[in-house]
From Swiss-Prot:
UniProt-listed CDD domains: Transaldolase_like
NCBIfam families: PRK03343.1 (NF002881), tal_mycobact (TIGR00876)
Record keywords: Cytoplasm, Pentose shunt, Schiff base, Transferase
Keyword Transferase: yes
Organism: Saccharopolyspora erythraea (strain ATCC 11635 / DSM 40517 / JCM 4748 / NBRC 13426 / NCIMB 8594 / NRRL 2338)
Residues at the catalytic site: K140 (schiff-base intermediate with substrate)
Origin superkingdom: Bacteria
GO BP, one annotated term: pentose-phosphate shunt
Protein name per the record: Transaldolase
Top EC category: transferase
Length: 366
């Protein structure tokens, strides 16, 4: 089979397609390699929710769990060994893509319980980088207030970073500043900037879910349903274009520094009244990443409506959407604060589920 034509058109428009899922079954069965060859997938993202699901219902981990139990590994250590092995093997599958260009990246998240602890986030990120030991790893760090300085410090050590849980353009600007500061420090530390990569994971569908819910109690709110998330992402892209055209970045680019690409995350559609490819179709733009759950990937392969760049030059109309939301009484600052808090809480809960699953598996294996 040749690469799907819809997904090829998406790639040609400058969108790198990453899969927002990973499991040992997907690796061992050859499915991941098949998605690379047939569905234009050039990277993978994982998160605690994905790993909790993978480990809870697959026999593929049994042998390693038995080995871990036999040597008395702690639950925390077992979780790390199980997840880093999957990430390492996925990184090897993507190695050729990585060596050919700027994709082939595989992302692994720091323990989400550290989201508000700068020092421990830095330590964990550096430990993960050493444990996986693959140049195409990206360590995921949340864009919390405490995460921002951690992002800079980890980049300064030459480590590639996927910044996650970004909801507002204001916080995204902080993230880009943290990235540039990290590159500046990495250069001062003697690192090759060309070897450092970063993406900024801007969450999409959750914004519509939260704002649409609030619009239900607003007179005339139906007019604004389903507009916020795409407008938000388009405003973020305008900020990206501005920052990476700046003299500050140009000085880093002259030393091999790369732009921190926007990555559209949370692109699975939650509302069944919307097209299941809307967060793909409407967010096509050069030098972006769209990380898709498998259902969104297959839907896009089947019926994505790829019409070229749908993002550039749309900041003014997107700002009008936000002005209308504010005029309707939607407290956008509160929306983004709630989404960040819920995002961290969701990943913490998944992490606890992951720990509990592995704890039970270790006990059964003894």
């Amino acid at each position: 089979m040749t690469t799907n034509s819809n997904l090829e058109a998406l790639s040609d428009a400058g969108v790198s397609i990453w899969l927002d899922d990973l499991s040992r079954k997907r690796i061992n069965s050859g499915n991941l390699a098949e998605l690379i060859s047939d569905y234009a997938v050039v990277g993978v993202t994982s998160n605690p929710t994905i790993f909790a699901k993978a480990l809870s219902n697959a026999a593929d981990y049994d042998e390693q769990v038995r080995e871990l139990a036999a040597r008395g590994a702690s639950v925390d250590d077992a979780v790390r060994e199980l997840t880093t092995r999957d990430i390492r093997e996925a990184a090897d599958i993507f190695r050729n893509i990585y060596e050919a260009g700027h994709d082939g990246r595989v992302s692994l998240e720091v323990d989400p319980r550290l989201a508000h602890d700068t020092e421990r986030t830095v330590a964990e990120a550096l430990d993960l980088w050493k444990a996986v030991d693959r140049p195409n790893l990206m360590v995921k760090i949340p864009a919390t207030v405490e995460g921002l300085p951690a992002i800079t410090r980890v980049l300064a050590e030459g480590v590639s970073v996927n910044v996650t849980l970004i909801f507002s353009v204001e916080r995204y600007r902080d993230v880009m500043d943290a990235y540039l500061a990290g590159l500046e420090q990495a250069k001062a530390n003697g690192h090759d900037l060309a070897r450092i990569a970063s993406v900024a994971s801007f969450f999409v569908s959750r914004v519509d879910t939260e704002i649409d819910k609030r619009l239900e109690s607003v007179e005339g709110g139906q007019e604004l349903r389903g507009k916020a998330a795409i407008a938000n992402a388009r405003l973020a892209y305008a900020a990206y274009e501005e920052v990476f055209a700046s003299d500050r970045f140009k000085a880093l680019a002259a030393e091999g520094g790369k732009p921190q690409r926007p990555l559209w995350a949370s692109t699975g559609v939650k509302d069944p009244s919307y097209s299941d490819t809307r967060y793909v179709d409407e967010l096509v733009a050069p030098n972006t990443v769209n990380t898709m759950p498998e259902a969104t990937l297959f839907a896009s392969a089947d019926h994505a409506d790829v019409r070229g760049d749908q993002v550039s030059g749309k900041a003014a109309e997107s700002q009008q959407v936000f002005d209308s939301l504010s005029a309707a009484g939607i407290d956008l600052d509160d929306v983004f604060a709630v989404l960040e808090r819920e995002g961290v809480d969701k990943f913490e809960k998944s992490w606890e589920e992951l720990l509990q699953t592995v704890r039970e598996q270790l006990d059964q294996a003894k």
